[in-house]
Amino acid sequence: MCSIGEDDFGDDGAAHAMAVESLPLGIVLSPGNCSKCDVNSDELYKLNFRTAECRECFLAYARHKFRAALGAAKILPRNAEVLLVLDGSAESLVLLDMLHFAQTQNTFKRLHCNARVVYVEEQQVQGRDPVHLEALQNLSTQYAPFDFYVIELGALPSSMQRIKDYSPSLNANNELIHKLQKLRSLTARQDYLQQQRKNLICSVAQCLRCTHVFESNISVDLATQLLTAIALGRGGSAALDVALLDDRLSGDVKLLRPLKDLNEQEIQFYIHAQRLKPLFQKGSRYGREHGQTASLQNLTSAFVANLQQNYASTVSTVFRTGDKIAANSNPEQSSCVHCRSTLDTELSDTLLAIEYSRSVSEAGVSLYKSGQDLEDLAKKRLENKDGLCHACRAIQAELDSGNLL
């Protein structure tokens, strides 16, 4: 029987509306007794709205969230082939450490799955130096017997290599980089890059014959992603963007987010408790260096972060709202050939207005055309059988030349 109370793992609920305690929050407090096990400890961990606890009790609490996310929904079959996506962030290292711990328990507590790890090298796309190989090799040694692979974003799935055989590519003719340069706005570039990354991970999973993919998104990531999806015109698929299970990937590959219930403070405490060393910070992701107002994604992220500082319930409210949105699961509807989201085949007045405005803008000096002609052109665009959803069609419209696919 678990010795940790059930109340420790529930939704924070109304606790978010409480005034912040006067007790200082931090990793290291003065030595004392753990409020859970009553053992004297030199280092206590104090989370928001929780009493101070020792390292072992905190780790048990955090790891229980990981196991509970997978166990409650029973979505991971026994002995499933799992691909863990590593990007060097603190969140991905926490996921790696938790999965490794779950794999090294005794038979009764062990998470029965066969795991592999793939590191997606994104630094070349961002114009930065690649990660130090020594750091990756140290991770491979520390988390044996997991098999570690490396693939560069924008490369073919067949170019994937084991960590011991990998050397950074010096090829500057990355097709993905050239296509990103053709997109006019940072919003379109970030959206396109996210879809390309997801498609690459799916292809890697198929190459390794993995049926499930673990990603390290936490609650604040999913809250931001929900609002971003709506702003980009991906509201129809927003439910799957924040769900524990995303089954839109091709080849029956399922994407899981087992850290969805963890917050940023818990991640930072776990990093400290396990003495993990992230390879990159979250703020180093593509396009963040251009500022908060450079794209819809950056602006939404800053908006959520600023609200969270003043109103502690922001992330929880948005995140839990996303949990309540039902996904459209009609198997008869076609999917977008780029992002795999369900296509909306009904003629929407909103989309018609957007395409009408775009037609007027492109007409220029040809505005002598009647309004009916422009409306017919807008309808024709919406009925175009290009296989793209509204959001991906917007990316296509941003391309100076060429095709999205």
Swiss-Prot record:
Which pathway does the database say it acts in?
Answer: tRNA modification; 5-methoxycarbonylmethyl-2-thiouridine-tRNA biosynthesis
UniProt cross-references to PANTHER family, sorted A to Z = CYTOPLASMIC TRNA 2-THIOLATION PROTEIN 2
Q: What does this protein do?
A: Plays a central role in 2-thiolation of mcm(5)S(2)U at tRNA wobble positions of tRNA(Lys), tRNA(Glu) and tRNA(Gln). May act by forming a heterodimer with NCS6/CTU1 that ligates sulfur from thiocarboxylated URM1 onto the uridine of tRNAs at wobble position.
The terms describing its cellular component in GO are: cytosol
Name the family the entry cites: Belongs to the CTU2/NCS2 family.
Q: Which UniProt keywords apply?
A: Cytoplasm, tRNA processing
Compartmental location = Cytoplasm
Q: What is this protein called?
A: Cytoplasmic tRNA 2-thiolation protein 2
What Gene Ontology biological process does one annotation of this record name? tRNA wobble position uridine thiolation
User: What GO molecular-function term can you cite, just one?
Assistant: nucleotidyltransferase activity
Cross-referenced InterPro entries: CTU2, Rossmann-like_a/b/a_fold
Which SUPFAM superfamilies does the annotation name?
Adenine nucleotide alpha hydrolases-like (SSF52402)
Coarsely, its chief localization is cytoplasm
